[in-house]
Amino acid sequence: MSTKDFNISRDEFRNITRCLDNEEFRNLFMEYCTELRDNRKQYEDELSMLEAQRGYDVKFLKPSPGYVIKTIVDGKGKGFINVCQSELVQKPTSTTGLNEDGTKGLKWSVPYAQTQPRKDYDNKRVECTVYDVMFHPDALHLASKNEGFRKLLNDTSLDAVEQSFKVRLDRANLRFPKLQYKGTPSSSVVREKLPHCDSLPKDELFDKLLPPLPNVPAPGKTGSERTTKTKNKENINRTAAVAAAAASPGNPFYTTPEYKIVQCRDVEYGEMTNELDAKIDVTIPRELKVVITLPLLKSTAECALDVTKTTLHLVSEKPARYKLELKLPYEVKESEGKATFNVEARSLTVTLPVLRKRNITLQDINSANVSASPAKEAGKLIEEIGTIIPPAGGDQQLARAASAPSAPEVPKKTIFPKFSVNKMENLLAFTLNVRNVDPSTIQLDNRTDSVHCRFSNVGNGYFPCFYVFFVRFPNALVTDVQHEEWDNNLIIQITLNTASVSSYQAGPDEHETVEYSIMEDIADKINKFGKEIEDDSLCIAVVRQATKASAKVKADALMSIEITKREEHGEPECDEKDGSEAEKARTLQKAKRNSRKKKKERSLSDSFCDHLKVIVENEASTEVAGEGATIQSSAKPIDSPEAKARKARSISECCPPKESDGGEEASTMPTLTRKYKSILKRSSYDRSISECSSVDDLGTSVEMARSIGEECRKTVRFNNSIRKQLFRSNSCILTMKKKALKRREVKRRADARRMSEGESTDNDEKDAHHHDDEHCSSSDQHDEKDAIEDDSGVSFDSESGDKEIAAAMKAEAIGGGGRGKAASKRKNSNKQGGAKSNGGKKQGTDAKNIQFKSDMIFDIEI
């Protein structure tokens, strides 16, 4: 309306102004506005007229403030009960009577009226539920004067809410805030049937529009009276029961809080397989979570929580009275539990890990069967006992049987484990090589001179395997036995009364044992490196043992490692029997080694090396025997009738001998060079003297070198040049391949052209060399150097490459006139291509020749 233009004439404006000046008009206008704003009264009048046409008298109950009760609804949310008053509710009445115990008292009948619950919010903007219970003003007046009547009024209000709306209220933790009314008051309707309602005409239209009427009560009693009496009776009974429970001192009134138990379990990948033990204990949770809702507590400082294996107890006195006694579905570890309190949700969470029981194994079943068999025998009520005549000496036999220790029963299928033993003074440690040993199944039977052990483990197929181990010491007594479980083995430590134990017996039981001896001393104190053992307190010996029946050492005897500790002062004498057995074992091993050597096929080089070694030994012996022998005695030719003549490299002539070297040093060099080994063969060969030193003045026979090494010669070359293949990241591989092929073709053509030019220029260079005076005037020292380089292939002058390039250029210049026209044309075409490119090609060619000369050549004598 504000968006439209408001058109008013001058006369209309003058009339409105004149009317507003009149006070009577203003009052009428205000009354009209009030009716438009609040039409509750009009609604009530119209509804009363409508119900009167149907035969009912309608009254509207408007609650007046009284006081408020605060409690908890269903253990979750807050609830407020408005105990208010209304004139339309009947007055409370009382009659005299007797209680159950015979005492006189008053029986009160307190009528009340209720409205439907509505949702509201508290000070923290948390949603809550509000209920209205209306009494007569006289009832509230009596409650303000009498504390007992006030309590009766509170119990009546709580009972009315619980019965009408099917909720559970917390009676133990009631609060009375300083409020007269919670929320906004709302009126309710009280409908009563008129006496002459049957004579009124019925209108079907009203019956369809309005809700159905309640059932007609029985004649003689009105509905209000019957309902009031029933409620009063229930209220009195409930009030008496509550008062009796509160009055009993031994059972104080507590509220049981809301709780829930959550079973938690981790899902593992192993449970998704088809293994036999994949689904074991799947239904048993890992932990239990008990969530307790405590809406009236801000903290758990005043709470007392007690947890056992099977129960949970919670008690709270202030600020709210809570008590919870809970029986847990599984046994828990009470010492490992933890509790947390959520302030926002007002809940206490108690986490308790579940105590898992050990799984039943096959051994438990066997033991149960064994224990059940004597129980069956004992179950017989009557047994026939015959007359038994004891033989002579029966008492002694019974005494022996009683004194002898009874061996524990062993399962039928057992395994004797592999073991090793370590000895230190009087302590023996037996290591049983068994994996995954179950510690709960280890049983040790400690006897006077023996130890019997039984245990089991879980095999690869998750099936238990049973092991037995029995050890006896004939000449010693067992004082203490201990065991240690590891992932890979089981260690049994046995302490004896003496350290002088030479042997022991071991086996699956006392009837099937094998004797094992312990080596107490090591005769040789020299280790494999040729050094004396400084601390020989711990000596390790490997001995092959034999059985009792055979005295000889067998090839399949058991192998054991014994560690013994020696005394610092004095060495104990070795047992003769042990020494003989060790000597026999060494002899047997040596015989086997020799037989393997005989069966091995030897090459010709191996056999010839043996002859060379014999020659070296003979030469060494002759030098020691006679100091005045000449050098020619070691230079005799080698004649080998059994072996063929083998080729070896002669002494190198690449380096001249030094005059300063003495004859003694030269005489010892042939002997020293025989200890070098070849890099091409596994067998040891005599290597020739280094190529860098000369042996012209040595006394070694040339005939020996020729007879051994001039027939076979092997050369090893090591080239310093490295071939590289480079690929660019921003180019195609196929393009680079084509370029490489093209460069390779150009290089091949250049090499072919260079080779053809070299053949034609060889003769010209020779003629130019004969006619050139400058080249003939070169020094003798330079000729010797060139000769050495040509012979060995190694250039000793760093500028030799440059000199060769200059000589080649001069030879080409001199022989240019004697060449044919074809040679001159090729030369001119090369010059036209550019001096820079020709120089590069020539330099590359000479560089290749220099690189070839710098290669290293090694000659190896065989």
UniProtKB/Swiss-Prot annotation:
Pfam family, one: PIH1_CS
Keywords of the record: Cytoplasm
Superkingdom of the source species: Eukaryota
Biased composition range(s): Basic and acidic residues: 564-586, 748-757, 766-785
GO CC, any one term: cytoplasm
Location in the cell: Cytoplasm
Gene Ontology BP annotations: axonemal dynein complex assembly; cilium-dependent cell motility
UniProt feature, compositional bias: Basic residues: 587-601
Keyword RNA-binding: no
Disordered: region residues: 208-229, 564-602, 626-670, 743-854
Function according to Swiss-Prot or TrEMBL: Required for cytoplasmic pre-assembly of axonemal dyneins, thereby playing a central role in motility in cilia and flagella. Involved in pre-assembly of dynein arm complexes in the cytoplasm before intraflagellar transport loads them for the ciliary compartment.
Family to which this protein belongs: Belongs to the PIH1 family. Kintoun subfamily.
HAMAP family for this protein: Kintoun
Protein name: Protein kintoun
